Structure formats: structure tokens, C-alpha cells
From Swiss-Prot:
Its main location: cytoplasm. The gene is asnS. The lineage of its organism: Bacteria, Pseudomonadati, Pseudomonadota, Gammaproteobacteria, Enterobacterales. GO terms for cellular component: cytoplasm. Keywords: Aminoacyl-tRNA synthetase, ATP-binding, Cytoplasm, Ligase, Nucleotide-binding, Protein biosynthesis. This is Asparagine--tRNA ligase. It is an enzyme of class 6 (ligase).
Length: 466
């Protein structure tokens, strides 16, 4: 007798007539008049539960089996048999059921069998992975993460662990969470009355990182091809379906690479990870297509077979102006494209994923390489049909004098970036990279609209429960 996951039984990896034990939780129990109970047991290893057929001859049938409710944890031992019913190929003929844990009060158990609103599930985030929806999201999230690591490993990239605590603002936007051990009731002050951060833990101001990019660049300028994959933080007071205060980012950095090089890398990576989901999570994707977004599977299949379009920002503005569409946000050269503009380009005009390149310098970060026209920078956004921007990237400014001018232009103190500037002083090279918001990627794959529902414990304004 061996302990096996539910997925092994359902996919035929446990031999028919073999005796196995599965451990999991009760999804449902159905009793027949013939004295047989059908207990659906799931363990999270796949979307579908395993049906255990339980005869009333089991010694604990009356006292325990007939009292099993949704959420009870059980250990079922029995024989694998071909299932005569529809919905599953195999089931287990139970020879023993051990109740590991009861649900105290089935009437008040938040994850009872009925379907709950997604808003309610956020209030019970510690229990919501037990639902079909969040369980499927978790497995897809895992598959995407593993595929990302696999893709970069197969293409010669090294994973770099960049710090979560930093003194640098990568975006220069100032929307950062402060890290401090100072006593808020008794803050040390300088002679001018300002908070004296030299008394703080790090001897200076420190923050949670908004991006691993700058640190990633240092390793790209030594290992050539690297990527970071970890949590980032933005103290942006945005209560929208697209924003989180804590989220995960994938950020490759490539030495000796142009903007076009990383645009090609972005296309290759997205197609690779989407194909991995289609191959490895067919059961979960079937659920998303049936219950969440009927286009979920077809959208990924179209994406992996599409050729990416490319367009200059200036030309994209002309396309939008000539479209005849009435946009909520006015279109003119110099604006940051809004979601409606991005989606028009990807869904209506190009009808394919599209890379928009060479944005006005005034709406982009200091580290992006200035183009020869002096007005635009070598930046790109990858726009996907159905969501808009999914990746943002650029060629990095490798010329020290131009970088210093940009820092000054944006009111940033170049001395705060002394180590970043050193990369341009000692063997500088052209290099490029991009950032992919992992939760936005999961939202695109699953069709789950709100990013709060694709991360285990969402952190948003006024919400840091669990």
C-alpha cells in the first residue's frame, strides 16, 4: 500500500487493482439508498477530486462516514478501479476511511459547497485556496513561475537575488514604503528639526524596493545574462483591479543587448510560458474557460501562434488619432498611453500582440537610453490583446554624461546613485532589460480580472490582513 496524490490516480499512474492511500479533504458526500456513499476527495494536486466509493459495511460508516461534510480531512485506503460513471476514468473502492480532522460547525464553515462571490473570498483569504477558483489560480501561478525559471535557465541566464531593502528609488517616483526601527513616539531630530535617519538601523533612509532592476544591471555587467524574480513594493494609493502594494516582478537584464534584442526576448519568453500552461494545466484552464472567461484557452493559443507587431510611439499616436474612436483620455503626442489606447492598438488595429517603442523621454524613467532625436528614449511596452500593457522595458543609458544629465533633469541626486554610475565608468556596455508584472501575467492567463485574486494574500491600501 502506497500513499499517492489524487492526480496519480486520475491520470492512470496508479495501476488498476492496486491498493493505495490518498489524503485530502472532502469536497462533497452523496449517499445512495443502497447503502453506499460517494465521497469526493481533493488534495490540490489537480483540479478534479477523486471519487471514493464507500460501502456501509465499513465499521465506522454509521458513526463517521455519514457525518462527513465539506472540508473534513480524511485518509482513504482502497483499491483503484475503472470508474463506470461519467466524469472520471478511475475511482477508489474504499476499504478504510480515517477521519483526520472534523469541521467544527458545518453550518458556519465559510467554504461550504455553495459558490461564493470573489469579493467574499478575499475576506477569508486563509481559506479561499480550498475553492475551485483559487486552487486553480495557485496551480497556474506555480506552473508560470516554474516555466519562467526554466526558460531563463535553458537560455543561459543566471537568477540573481536582489535586495528587498534599498536606499535607491528605481522609478524616481517616490512611491516607496519606508523601512525604519525609529521610535515613532520619540523621533531623533537634526538641528533643523528634520528626522535624523543617521540614528536609524541602517544609518540612513531605507525603503522597500520598487524594482530589482538597478541591482540586476550590476550583475548583467559581469555575468552577461541575468534575471530577477521576486516581490516588489509600491506605496501607490490606487484601489483598482490592476494595482497591488506588494507584487512580484520578473526582470531580465542583458549585456551587449539592444532594445530590439529584449523585445525579441519578451516575445520568446511569453510564448514559452503560455505554452507550458496549455501543456501542463489543461484541467485548470478548462475550468477557467468554462467558469471565468470563455476565451481563456483560445486567447493563449492565438498568442503563441501570433507574430508580434512593432510600432513606434509616434506612429501609434497617429494610428489612434486616425481611428475615429472616441477615447475617454485625449490622444496627443507626449501622453502616456492609457489602457484603452493600448487595447485599441492590440485588439482593433493590429489584432495581435504589439511592441510600442521609442516613447517621449518626459514620461519615462531616468535610466532609459536617450535616442538621437533628444526627445525620445529607447523604451518599449508589450501590449497584449485583452489586457493592454503586460511588459515594460528599455535599453539602459550606458553613457555616464547622458545619465548624469537625466538624473539632474529629474531632480535626482547623482551621489545617491554613485554605484550605479560606476557601471558606466568601468567598462560600460550597451545593455537592456524589461519588467514583467507577474500578477498581471496570471490575470491575463486565467481571465481572473482582479489581481487581488491571483496572489495568495493581497496587500492593498487599508488592507494588510493575514
Amino acid at each position: 500500500m502506497s500513499v499517492v496524490p489524487v492526480v496519480d490516480v486520475l491520470q492512470g499512474r496508479a495501476a488498476v487493482d492496486s491498493e493505495v492511500t490518498v489524503r485530502g479533504w472532502v469536497r462533497t458526500r452523496r449517499d445512495s439508498k443502497a447503502g453506499i456513499s460517494f465521497v469526493a476527495v481533493y488534495d490540490g494536486s489537480c483540479f478534479d477530486p477523486l471519487q471514493a466509493v464507500v460501502n456501509n459495511t465499513l465499521p465506522n460508516y454509521q458513526d463517521e462516514v455519514l457525518h462527513l461534510t465539506t472540508g473534513c480531512s480524511v485518509e482513504v485506503t482502497g483499491t483503484v478501479v475503472a470508474s463506470p460513471g461519467e466524469g472520471q476514468s478511475f475511482e477508489i473502492q474504499a476499504t478504510a476511511i480515517k477521519v483526520v480532522g472534523w469541521v467544527d460547525d458545518p453550518d458556519t464553515y465559510p467554504m461550504a459547497a455553495k459558490r461564493h462571490s470573489i469579493e467574499y473570498l478575499r475576506e477569508v483569504a486563509h481559506l479561499r485556496p480550498r475553492t475551485n477558483l483559487i486552487g486553480a489560480v495557485a496551480r497556474v501561478r506555480h506552473t508560470l513561475a516554474q516555466a519562467i525559471h526554466r526558460f531563463f535557465d535553458e537560455n543561459g541566464y543566471f537568477w540573481v537575488s536582489t535586495p528587498l531593502i534599498t536606499a535607491s528609488d528605481t522609478e524616481g517616483a517616490g512611491e516607496m514604503f519606508r523601512v525604519s526601527t525609529l521610535d515613532l513616539e520619540n523621533l531623533p531630530r537634526t538641528d533643523t528639526g528634520a528626522v535624523d535617519f543617521s540614528e536609524d538601523f541602517f544609518g540612513k533612509e531605507a525603503f522597500l524596493t520598487v524594482s530589482g532592476q538597478l541591482n540586476g544591471e550590476t550583475y548583467a555587467c559581469a555575468l552577461s545574462k541575468v534575471y530577477t524574480f521576486g516581490p516588489t513594493f509600491r506605496a501607490e494609493n490606487s484601489n483598482t483591479s490592476r494595482h497591488l502594494a506588494e507584487f512580484w516582478m520578473v526582470e531580465p537584464e542583458v549585456a551587449f543587448a539592444s532594445l530590439d534584442d529584449v523585445a525579441g526576448l519578451a516575445e520568446k519568453m511569453l510564448k514559452y510560458v503560455f505554452q507550458a500552461v496549455l501543456n501542463e494545466r489543461a484541467d485548470d484552464m478548462k475550468f477557467f474557460a468554462e467558469r471565468v472567461d470563455k476565451d481563456a484557452v483560445d486567447r493563449l493559443q492565438r498568442f503563441v501562434t501570433s507574430d508580434f507587431a512593432q510600432v513606434d510611439y509616434t506612429d501609434a499616436i497617429e494610428i489612434l488619432l486616425a481611428s475615429g474612436q472616441k477615447f475617454e483620455n485625449d490622444v496627443s503626442w507626449g501622453i502616456d498611453l492609457s489602457s484603452e489606447h493600448e487595447r485599441y492598438l492590440a485588439e482593433q488595429h493590429f489584432k495581435a500582440p504589439v511592441v510600442v517603442k521609442n516613447y517621449p523621454k518626459d514620461i519615462k524613467a531616468f535610466y532609459m537610453r536617450m535616442n538621437e532625436d533628444g526627445k525620445t528614449v529607447a523604451a518599449m511596452d508589450v501590449l497584449a490583446p485583452g489586457i493592454g500593457e503586460i511588459i515594460g522595458g528599455s535599453q539602459r543609458e550606458e553613457r555616464l554624461d547622458v545619465l548624469d544629465a537625466r538624473l539632474a533633469e529629474m531632480g535626482l541626486n547623482k551621489e545617491d546613485y554613485w554605484w550605479y554610475r560606476d557601471l558606466r565608468r568601468y567598462g560600460t556596455v550597451p545593455h537592456s532589460g524589461f519588467g514583467l508584472g507577474f500578477e498581471r501575467l496570471i490575470s491575463y492567463v486565467t481571465g481572473v480580472q482582479n489581481v487581488r485574486d491571483v496572489i495568495p494574500f493581497p496587500r492593498t491600501p487599508r488592507n494588510a490582513s493575514f
